[in-house]
Amino acid sequence: MKLLIWGLSGTMGNLISVAAQKDSHWSNIAGVDAKNPTSNLKHTPEVIIDFSHPSALEGVLDYAMAHGVPLVIGTTGFEKEHLEAIDQAAKHIPVLQATNMSLGMNILFSLVEQVAGMLKNKADIEVIESHHNRKMDAPSGSAVTIVECIEKGLGEARKHQHGREGQCPREKGEIGVHAIRGGNIVGFHEANFINELETVKVSHEAHDRSVFAQGALEAAKFVVNQPTGLYHMKDVLGLT
């Protein structure tokens, strides 16, 4: 199968390329980045994996729709208008969008929703994420997804408190979200459900970025066999 990696020169783009070269499923692997535009491509891909930058989204969506190519989006840091554009594209081609491609992280998404649904208003909720010092967006896309899953379990949206300083007593019902940046941390996420008597922690730590590359390739194998629509990693992993 012919694979196009959008954002080949980036860390994840390189990892996906290396992983794909070891998998006989992929007969042709090409890449697009600032130095290698789509005009240089020799073949029309059968699936695209995008790990680039929010500013590149319009280009990848236009190309995928123009050629009718299924698309996997692993880029994070999107604004509301980006997500709306992805929703529109999914009306024309199969699109799989995920803030995290690992099996373990997607299990965590499912678990925090369940815990939130069980505890409801019986706990203060704090989400902590840690990444390497080169990560551009904060909070991480995965932390945003964790909060979304928690709110789904609660059955309501909550105020989000990003960090704390000065005189700021905790408001009842708010969800605290905290980002740590340092060194070469691959990715750590933890949801804390805290009350006066006990704390429930649900956490995940990635040891190697290749886990995201493998997940992206599995997502690509999945999305090529799907009809037009918007999909997520829980669909790939059967967690729906």
Swiss-Prot record:
An annotated GO BP: diaminopimelate biosynthetic process
Annotated pathway: Amino-acid biosynthesis; L-lysine biosynthesis via DAP pathway; (S)-tetrahydrodipicolinate from L-aspartate: step 4/4
Binding site for (S)-2,3,4,5-tetrahydrodipicolinate: H132, G141, S142
Protein name in UniProt: 4-hydroxy-tetrahydrodipicolinate reductase
GO molecular function, one term: 4-hydroxy-tetrahydrodipicolinate reductase
SUPFAM superfamilies noted in UniProt: Glyceraldehyde-3-phosphate dehydrogenase-like, C-terminal domain, NAD(P)-binding Rossmann-fold domains
A Pfam family that the UniProt record links to this protein: DapB_N
Family designation: Belongs to the DapB family.
Top-rank taxon: Bacteria
HAMAP family: DapB
Keywords: Amino-acid biosynthesis, Cytoplasm, Diaminopimelate biosynthesis, Lysine biosynthesis, NAD, NADP, Oxidoreductase
Places the protein is found: Cytoplasm
Lineage: Bacteria, Bacillati, Bacillota, Clostridia, Peptostreptococcales
InterPro entries: DapB_C (IPR022663), DapB_N (IPR000846), DapB_N_CS (IPR022664), DHDPR_bac (IPR023940), NAD(P)-bd_dom_sf (IPR036291)
Binding of NADP(+), residues: K35
Residues at the catalytic site: H131, K135
